[in-house]
Amino acid sequence: MTVAPPPLLAAASLSFLRQDEPVFGPLDFELHAGQLALVEGDNGSGKTTLLRVLAGLLHVDAGELRWRGEPLRRDECAGEIVFLGHQLGLKGDLSPRENLRIAAGLHGTCEGTNPERALHDVGLAGYEDEPVRRLSAGQKKRAALARLRLVPATLWLLDEPYANLDRQGIALVNRLLEGHVAAGGAALVTSHGAVSFHGGEPRRIRMHA
C-alpha cells in the first residue's frame, strides 16, 4: 500500500505573543506540495506575523512547526523557503540585475542562474541595469517578484504580493503562483481579494487573535 507523503509544512498549536498580548493562535494547519493557501483575517489578526514566523524572522511562543514530517530546522530548509514582504529586500543603489545576483548568492544558486531571463519574465526587460531607486513602486515589486523566478524555493511566503501592481502585474502574480503550484511547489499568500487561481480551490487559513 502506498503511503501518502507528509505535509510539506504543518503547524500545531502555534501561538505568538507581543508584550505578553496574543497576536495569533493557537493555530493549526497543514500545507501540502502542490497547494496554495490564502491567509485570511481582519487587520491586526497576525497574517504578516505568521508569514514572518514561517520565514524564520520571528520566533513563536508556543506550538510546533514540522517540515516534511520532521521538526522544522531552519538550517536544513532555509534554501527551500522564500519570503516576499512589504519590505521588498532590494538595495536602491543597485540594479535589478545586481539585486537578483545577491539573492541567488544568499540561496546558494549563483551558478547557472539567469537574472536577465527572470527580469524579462516579470516585464522588466530594458530595466536590468537601472538603479532600483529610480523605478516606480510597481516596477520595484516586479523586481522583487523576479526572485521567485530565480530562486528554486519550494515554499513561497507572499505578503500582499498584489500591492502596487496594475492589472497586468496582478495577472503576472497569478501566473507565477499557478506555475509554481503546478510544478509541485506550495505557497502561503495574504491578500485582499486579488487572487484568481485556476489550479483548484485554494486552502484557506483563518487568523484569529
Protein language model regions, located:
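Helix-to-loop junction immediately C-terminal to a conserved catalytic motif
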Residues: 55
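Conserved ABC transporter NBD signature motif
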Residues: 63-79
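Q-loop/switch helix immediately C-terminal to the Walker
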Residues: 87, 92-108, 114
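Conserved ABC ATPase signature
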Residues: 93, 131-138
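Conserved ABC ATPase "signature" region
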Residues: 101, 112-127
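Hydrophobic anchor residue at the start of the ABC signature
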Residues: 145, 184
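ABC ATPase C-loop
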Residues: 148-149
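Catalytic Walker B motif of ABC-type/P-loop ATPase nucleotide-binding domains
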Residues: 156-160
